[in-house]
Every structure is written in C-alpha cells, then in structure tokens.
C-alpha cells in the first residue's frame, strides 16, 4: 500500500514538474517598462536635416537602431494635439473616441471651450478644472491598468494640460503638467494620486525654479547653425523663460524653451527611480511630452537658430533620458516609442512668401457674412450661434420658430460658403456622418474626425495650403494635407533596426502596443497590429 501511494505521489510530482516547465516555457514575455515620447512639432524632415549634428545616443539611437514606420499616416483631419494623441492611444478616431480637437463649441452654453474642461473636477495647484470625460473610449494605458489592477503603474509628465490628459487617459496613477504663470507642476483631482510626491517635492524644494529660470542661449557658436547659411548677419539670441509672452500677459514663454523639456526629463526620471518603474515583470508605463516649439513661432520649417537649438538641446535630453533608463531598468527591458503631431512642412506664411497659393481662414468675419446672407433670405435674426474647427452651428430654435426647412437652411449655408476664399467644400453634417466606402478618401478622413455630440450643422474643408485660425490667430490644427504623415519610431526591448515601408495608419499603433504587451486592445480600436516587428502569434 505504501508503495502504491508512493507511486501515485511520484507520478503527480512528475506531472506537476513537467507542467511547471511547460508553463515557464510558454510564459508571455513583455517589456517591463514602456516609455512614450510625444514631441510637439516634430518633423521627419527636421530629423533628417539635423542628423549630422545629433549625438549618437539621442535621436540617432532611436532612429538608427529602432523600427521606423516610414509610411504611417493620420486617418483624421488635423484639429490639434488632443485629437492626434487620443487617436494614437485609443487606436480609434474621433467618430468613436469623441476628442475632435483641443477645443470644441459647446452648444449648451454657446461657448468654445477646452476639450478637457470639467467643472465637476478640482484643480490641484491650479484653477484649471479638467478631466478625460470627453474621451469616450479606453486607451492602451487604460487597458494596461485594467489588465494588471493595482500592479501596473502609469504616469504622465507633460508640458500642456490637454496633452497630459490625453496621454493619461482615464486610469493613469498621476499626471502632471507645467503651469507657465506660477511656474510649477500642477494637476487635476481626476487622477487617483493627485499631484505625485516627486512633482510636489520639485515645487517645494526649488528644483522646478532652478530648471525653469535657466537663461536660453545658443548651445554652439551661432555661425555653425543652418540658419546662418541664409543670414550672414545672424545674431545670437537670449531668452529668459520667465519673461512674459506679451506686454499685458501673465503667461510666460517657459513652455516654448528648452527649460520645459529639461523639467519633463527631470521629473520623469525621478518617477522612474522613486516609484521603481520597470522593477518587476508587471509592465509599467510612463508617457512624456516634449516640444520643439519656439517663442513667437511663425514658421514650421527650420528657419531660425532657435528652432535648431530646441532640437539640439532636446537631443541631449533624450540621450540622458535613455542613459538613465538603461542604468535603472535596462533598455533591453524597455520599449520606447516616439511620435509627433500632425504638422505641415511649411506654414501658409512661408508658402505665400514663395508665391504658392495659401492663406489663413478666419471665422469671425466669415460667420458675420453668413449671418447677413441668411438675414437677407429669412429675416433679421441671429441665424448663426457659433463656429469652431470648421463646424458652423445654426440657431435651431430660431429656425423651428420660423417654421423653416432645416435642411434647406443648411444647404443655403453650404452654397454660400463655397464662395469664400480658401474653402474647398461645405457639407451638411448628416451627409458627412453617413460617408462610407474608401477609408482613405478625404471625405472618410473628415467623417472620422467628427463626433455626433460636438458636430456643427455644416462642416467645411479648406484648400491645400490653408489653415484655420481662431480669434487670437492661433492655428486650429496644423496640417491641411490630404494625406498627413508623421514620424513614428519604436526602439528597445527585443526590437531590431528595421524600416517598415508598408502603409499603416496611426490607429494601428495602439493595437501594436497591445499585442506587444499581450493585453486587450482599447474598446473602440479600429486598427490592426503592425505585423512586421511583432513576434507574437
């Protein structure tokens, strides 16, 4: 009998041992840390032009030793960084995820407001009350949090609040962004940790002030900059990040200086070290926003020494960031992805200076003319309630009161808008929302960029070379190209250098990350994993 039980015990032990070996051999391999690098204003052309000036461990390490998605295009219309980032992180488009731009026209109060504004939240260190409530789908960061509840740690360090919230999604442990009035890290009560202790310490111990007050001068002799080849009298520049943007403004130029990037790297590394990101087999994620914008920027191209210097200094910051991550976590255990926003190579100003048709579309005067036209047709009333982001909002209440045919009024506005300089097309919203067929067409991109909750009644598009500007002459979106490409790189972990020439869309990024991390795709994802460099079945 003893021999019988002994045999059973040995048999069970044997199969348990074999099962354990099999489980170990089939265990899913994941990167321990995912680092997302979003660079506002990044252009592939700039990376190529400045390649010879970069250090080997910064941009070059990512671009030369990583995976280059050569033909990655945006399948949405450019309407601001919020929409671009939300599309990257959700693998979906505004038609589903709801983030149609940095701002939108709120029909309830007839105001243009930030896409992240939320009066139900509280600001921490700021009067700004923001949340991700208008982001209607989950992100890849959210799915990571849900896949490993209370284990996966996720943080965001950003320059701007809109970018911070879109990178953080709904479930980031903490996000922080720069307050460029009071010069400190701030956040929103929407995220469970509030202002993380590392950011708070930088505010209190003077670490933020030290970095944010660095005088910005050229990194090298001014004659060595590309801009000097076009201007032999080019003078060295000097900026103080605490100086005001304009005479009557309380806002500083901090966010458009290298100091902003230094602050992001410093806090990001503090979080990685003190929160022990990447220390175990449960993947963690940190998203970082940088910029290559300069004070008072008018051009998208490399026409200034300041623009070059932003790139050169950011290159050194990225080199330091990667070196520290390699020391603390190991780049072989870290997946890095780097991307920019939609932006044209040349601004309308540059195109115009070279006799290429281009211009800026300003809504204020245009909407006044549209209203005058409708008054001539239907009577002396306020027929237009608002406009933003190529969306025209009609006074539905007044149209109903006058018992007018709504579609007839819509069509009248469409017909009139076609006479405006810079306008390519004008369509009733119901027509745009019903567009089907070729997903690569211009109208499909327009449909992708509209959400029923925030859409106007008439939607216009602009001619090539034209950009919309708001009442302060700030661009609403930065690209009007029919097909908009953006640099995108993956680096680190198990990836080998590769150039992927297969056409992909930006909605394919989130499912690719999900596949690498072996987690569910975001719940509104319409993209597909990029198979060229993902090894999972």
Question: Residue locations for each model-derived region?
Answer:
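A long, amphipathic alpha-helix that forms part
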Residues: 46, 254-280, 293-334, 513
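Secreted, luminal/periplasmic, and some membrane-associated catalytic domains
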Residues: 54, 80, 102-129, 137, ...
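Short, solvent-exposed turn/loop segments enriched in Gly/Ser/Thr/Pro and often Arg
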Residues: 69-89, 156-164, 289-291, 335, ...
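His/Asp/Glu-rich, glycine-adjacent segments
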Residues: 92-93, 101-282, 291-298, 421-425
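Substrate-binding rim/cap in mid-to-C-terminal beta-strand-loop elements of soluble/periplasmic
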Residues: 364-405, 475-517, 531-536
């Amino acid at each position: 009998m003893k021999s019988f039980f002994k045999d059973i015990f040995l048999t069970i032990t044997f199969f348990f041992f074999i099962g354990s070996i099999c489980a170990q051999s089939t265990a899913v391999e994941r990167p321990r840390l995912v680092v997302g690098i979003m660079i506002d204003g990044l252009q592939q052309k700039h990376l190529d032009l400045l390649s010879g000036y970069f250090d080997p461990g910064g941009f070059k390490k990512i671009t030369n030793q990583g995976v280059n998605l050569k033909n990655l295009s945006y399948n949405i219309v450019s309407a601001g960084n919020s929409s671009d980032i939300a599309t990257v992180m959700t693998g979906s488009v505004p038609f589903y995820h709801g983030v149609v731009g940095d701002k939108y026209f709120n029909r309830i109060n007839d105001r243009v407001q930030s896409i992240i504004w939320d009066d139900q939240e509280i600001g921490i260190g700021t009067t700004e009350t923001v949340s991700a409530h208008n982001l209607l789908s989950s992100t890849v960061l959210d799915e990571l949090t849900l896949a490993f509840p209370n284990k996966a740690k996720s943080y965001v360090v950003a320059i701007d609040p809109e970018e911070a919230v879109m990178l953080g999604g709904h479930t980031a442990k903490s996000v922080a962004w720069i307050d460029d009035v009071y010069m400190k890290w701030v956040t929103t009560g929407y995220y469970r940790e509030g202002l993380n202790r590392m950011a708070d310490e930088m505010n209190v111990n003077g670490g933020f002030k030290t970095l944010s007050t660095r005088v910005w001068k050229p990194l090298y002799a001014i004659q060595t900059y590309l801009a000097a080849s076009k201007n032999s009298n080019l003078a060295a520049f000097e900026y103080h990040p605490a100086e005001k943007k304009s005479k009557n403004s309380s806002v500083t130029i901090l966010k458009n200086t290298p100091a902003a990037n230094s602050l992001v790297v410093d806090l990001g590394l503090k979080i990685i070290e003190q929160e022990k990101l990447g220390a175990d087999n449960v993947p963690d994620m940190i998203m970082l926003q940088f910029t290559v914008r300069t004070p008072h920027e008018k051009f998208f191209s490399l026409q200034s020494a300041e623009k070059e210097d932003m790139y050169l200094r950011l290159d050194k910051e990225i080199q330091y960031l990667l070196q520290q991550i390699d020391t603390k976590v190991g780049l072989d255990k870290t997946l890095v992805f780097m991307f920019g926003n939609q932006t044209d190579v040349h601004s309308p100003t540059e195109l115009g200076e070279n006799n290429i048709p281009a211009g800026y579309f300003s809504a204020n005067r245009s909407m006044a003319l549209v209203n005058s036209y409708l008054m001539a047709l239907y009577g002396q009333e306020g027929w237009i309630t608002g406009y933003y982001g190529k969306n025209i909002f009609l006074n539905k209440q007044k149209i109903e009161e006058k018992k007018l045919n709504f579609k007839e009024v819509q069509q009248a506005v469409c017909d009139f808008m076609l006479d405006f300089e810079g306008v390519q097309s004008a369509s009733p919203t119901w027509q745009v929302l019903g567009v089907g067929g070729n997903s690569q067409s211009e109208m499909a991109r327009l449909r992708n960029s509209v959400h029923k909750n925030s859409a106007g009644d008439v939607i216009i598009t602009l001619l090539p070379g034209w950009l919309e500007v708001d009442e302060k002459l700030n661009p609403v979106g930065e690209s009007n190209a029919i097909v908009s490409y953006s640099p995108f790189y993956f680096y680190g972990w198990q990836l080998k250098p590769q150039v992927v020439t297969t056409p992909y869309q930006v909605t394919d990024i989130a499912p690719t990350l999900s596949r690498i991390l072996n987690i569910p795709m975001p719940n509104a994802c319409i993209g597909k994993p990029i198979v060229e460099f993902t090894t999972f079945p």
